[in-house]
Amino acid sequence: MQSEKDGVEIDQGIFLSQVLAVADAGMHLCQSMLLPRPEAVERGAEFLRSGAINFGPAKIERQGKAAVVSVCNPRFLNAEDDDTLDDTEIAADIAILDPASEICVLRGDFVDHPKYKGRKIFSAGINLTHLYRGKIPLLWYIRRDMGVVNKMFRGVATGHTSPDEIYGGTHEKPWIAGLDGFAIGGGCQYLLAMDYVVAGSDAYMTLPARKEGIIPGAANLRLTRFLGARVARQAIMMGRRLECDSPEGRRICDLIVAPDQMEKTIAQVVENFTSSGVVSAASNRRAFRAWEEPLDTFRRYMAVYCREQAYCHFSPALIANLERHWNAAQRKI
């Protein structure tokens, strides 16, 4: 149980905060976390040959010119936890490095819940039941935000070249998200790292950090670019729900379509992106980041995040919030 932990992991957060606070050491850590996973390198040839790999908690499939990564946690509405993180990152690495595709797509797979029977759901965010039961370690947050999410935003690094936008670069592709149903918490965080978002007209986004008692990844760094400081604070600190088909929602979602048109529309968006090639896509992504969020800015943010998330993760308020808002004590793994 999370409430029974001694909190020794707080020292991990403080240590990583201090590492990231030093420019050279922090940039080295950022680069290391952007390197492809060894499993992705090992299985890249398999994907090139077969066009599909199912890891269980995540899968990847080549559809035309797109490498489609799907999170598959059907019992928990495609929530993220310690069982899904590694496979999602490996799948993302393979998608980015795949020489036979030009663009990447992020989806949530079909779920088991009777309310959403036969439907795909993008993401329910962090698995709050696992969090309450002590199954989410502190390093999970840091590995996720410096790993898979940052790889989607920045690309995959190499061992000999800095991933910094000014002095080096990464191997990267554009990312499209297909938002079915909802993007809660970490699901919404993924959207802020995407280049294009297609959403169903019934879909919504939330960042319920107040009810969870944690910091919502890099959303505090990125959300203001989309919504401005006031609405970003309302979303993160007051739990404001953002309907995708609303003025605020359309500042994150590029295209709103009927739910039954998602597959067709995503395929058309992929075609529009790739019909003239994507030669300049990586260059334009780097140019945006150089102004909006250079790697050094991310490093400085993560220095604060590692420390503050450690305190949040072991706060009695986290347990109280999960019991009050999630009825966590009555839920089973």
Predicted regions and their residues:
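A structural preference for short, pocket-lining loop segments at secondary-structure junctions
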Residues: 64, 69-70, 87-171, 176, ...
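C-terminal alpha-helix plus adjacent terminal tail
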Residues: 1-64, 111, 243, 264, ...
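Hydrophobic/aromatic residues within transmembrane alpha-helices
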Residues: 69, 106, 127, 190-191, ...
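Extended acidic/polar regulatory tracts at the flanks of large eukaryotic scaffold/adaptor proteins
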Residues: 76-77
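Crotonase-fold acyl-CoA enzyme core
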Residues: 164-278
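Active-site donor-nucleotide binding/catalytic segment of nucleotide-sugar enzymes
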Residues: 73
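Phosphate/oxyanion-binding active-site loops and adjacent basic polyanion-contact surfaces
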Residues: 80-85
